[in-house]
Design a protein with these regions (language model features):
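PEST-like low-complexity, intrinsically disordered acidic/proline/serine-rich tracts
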Residues: 22-253
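Bacterial N-terminal signal peptides that target proteins for export
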Residues: 1-12
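Hydrophobic h-region of N-terminal signal peptides that target proteins for export
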Residues: 12-21
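Generic recognition of cysteine residues
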Residues: 6, 20-23
Length: 253
């Protein structure tokens, strides 16, 4: 309920800003910027092959027991954090398959808000000219803490593409197949409107702790939708499913 109310509060504040663009003294969104606002329904994401992994990256990947992909295992045998309703983390949240990939973009004067249907979470991509934080998770008292969804800034390129960069995301599964993501990783997202109802998202990853070189993680096409649905992971229900269905089904006969 709290996450749902928070999402409504964010939407309400963003709508207030957008609705008052003509008010005296209120800054307006530059007309040169492509307006990405709207609900976007994603595809059944196909992940691109990752770059060769480092020794540590390969060890983490080998230890992962995913629910999806060529190495998938039964739910009862999986160690995927989402079976416990943990947050998806980043960049996994932008690499989900449909219908989990549905999202809404709300464009304001100083940031782009990205609201996700699954688990009702949101992230802020700041466009006010700030820089990305340095030394996230470092030992200095001034070092910012890692976040599930990292720290993000964005800008518009000359060809109208919205480019977002993210650092400082917690070390989590990078996608549903168990590819690793390190704290020092850097993720670039490129959002391009192909037409009024079609949005392309290209995701590039540079994570030298886990991969030997940068690589293209995915290229997805979203279609415009009307509204998001409520899609929450409930820990008590997830545990009941494991205890009453998944584990008995996996037990030796």
């Amino acid at each position: 309920m709290r996450s749902y109310l928070c999402r409504l509060a964010v939407l309400a504040s963003a709508t207030a800003v957008l609705g008052c663009q003509g008010c005296s003294g209120t800054p307006t969104i530059s007309q040169s910027h492509t307006d990405l606002s709207g609900v976007w329904l994603g595809p059944a994401t196909t992940l691109e092959p990752s770059a060769p992994m480092t020794v540590r990256g390969q060890a983490l990947f080998d230890a992962a027991k995913p629910l999806y992909g060529p190495r998938s295992v039964p739910v009862a045998d999986s160690n995927d954090p989402v079976t416990r309703c943990d947050p998806q983390g980043f960049p996994r949240i932008i690499l989900l398959r449909a219908p989990l990939s549905a999202m809404e973009l709300v464009q304001t004067t100083d940031r782009v808000l990205q609201l996700f249907q699954y688990q009702g979470v949101y992230r802020e991509i700041w466009t006010d000219g700030r820089s990305l934080p340095a030394d996230v998770g470092g030992s200095s008292p001034q070092s910012p803490d890692p976040r599930w969804y990292g720290y993000s800034i964005g800008h518009w390129s000359n060809d109208g593409v919205f480019v977002a960069e993210t650092v400082g995301a917690m070390e989590t599964w990078g996608d549903e197949e168990g590819h690793p993501h390190g704290l020092g990783g850097r993720v670039e997202e490129r959002y391009r409107l192909l037409d009024h109802d079609t949005l392309e998202l290209v995701v590039n990853i540079d994570d030298p702790e886990m991969y030997q070189k940068p690589f293209l993680a995915s290229k997805q096409v979203f279609k415009r939708g009307k509204e998001l649905s409520e899609q929450l992971c409930v820990p008590s229900v997830a545990q009941q499913y494991l205890d009453l269905i998944a584990k008995p089904a996996a037990a030796p006969k």
